[in-house]
């Protein structure tokens, strides 16, 4: 099948009147941060080529990338992909994931929704995540880990760890290469650091108690800050 992907500025070209052959699949994209930019109209849904989606849970590029941790909020993935399916985006789903391990849970959620959306809907995203944690770490540890994971996703939804100092990789003025350009007060920054430190301590405690074959799984699938990763 042939596919047309109106990514970034190409969507503006499409909206300006670009004609795409009817048999070509239209693959709609998110904004690189989890929000789909265009849902097909009735006319686009009736096309022979059908509709697909190209969705990010990891992104390299401007204005800010996020590659370090798997911080894409599962509830946002669930909401956007459910809406995509309901709006007729059903032929092809592609996930931009970058490093697979940090986003292993988001990948599983995305693929399970692509395979059987109704089953995931009936289960609910929280129960789906719970099943993942129980399978990988056992019931008792899942009881302790799920609140940690949910709080980490909540914090990252407000502002991802990679965005705390921004990604001015080509900035010539050195004063902008540090956190001084973050529009938060000192109190907000300290509260954020304390919240992540608390999460990190909880994850590290579980990590030390895990059998060797499960340590890497927790290390890479928990959206935890850097100091926990030093414990290796």
What label would you give each PLM region?
Residues 2, 192, 229-230:
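Basic side chains
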Residues 189, 193-196, 200-203, 210:
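Long amphipathic alpha-helices with heptad-repeat character
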Residues 206-219:
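Short, solvent-exposed, charged loop/turn and helix-capping segments
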Residues 220, 225-231:
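Single conserved hydrophobic/aromatic residue that forms the stacking wall/gate
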């Amino acid at each position: 099948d042939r596919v047309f992907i109106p990514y970034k500025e190409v969507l503006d070209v499409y909206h300006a009147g670009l004609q795409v052959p009817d048999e070509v699949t239209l693959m709609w994209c998110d904004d690189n941060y989890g929000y789909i930019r265009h849902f097909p109209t009735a006319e686009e849904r009736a096309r022979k080529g059908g509709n697909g989606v190209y969705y990010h849970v990891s992104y390299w590029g401007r204005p800010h990338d996020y590659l370090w941790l798997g911080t894409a909020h599962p509830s946002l993935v669930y909401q956007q992909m459910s809406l995509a399916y309901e709006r007729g985006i059903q032929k092809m789903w592609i996930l931009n994931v970058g490093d697979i391990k940090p986003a292993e849970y988001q990948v599983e959620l995305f693929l399970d929704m692509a395979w059987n959306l109704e089953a995931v809907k009936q289960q609910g995203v929280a129960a789906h995540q719970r099943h993942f944690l129980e399978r990988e770490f056992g019931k008792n540890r899942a009881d302790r880990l799920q609140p940690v994971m949910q709080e980490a996703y909540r914090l990252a939804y407000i502002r991802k760890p990679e965005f705390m100092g921004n990604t001015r990789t080509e900035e010539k003025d050195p004063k902008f290469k540090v956190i001084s350009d973050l529009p938060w007060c000192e109190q907000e920054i300290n509260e954020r650091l304390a919240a992540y430190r608390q999460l990190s301590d909880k994850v590290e405690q579980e990590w030390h108690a895990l059998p060797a074959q499960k340590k890497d799984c927790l290390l890479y699938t928990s959206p935890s800050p850097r100091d926990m990763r030093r414990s290796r």
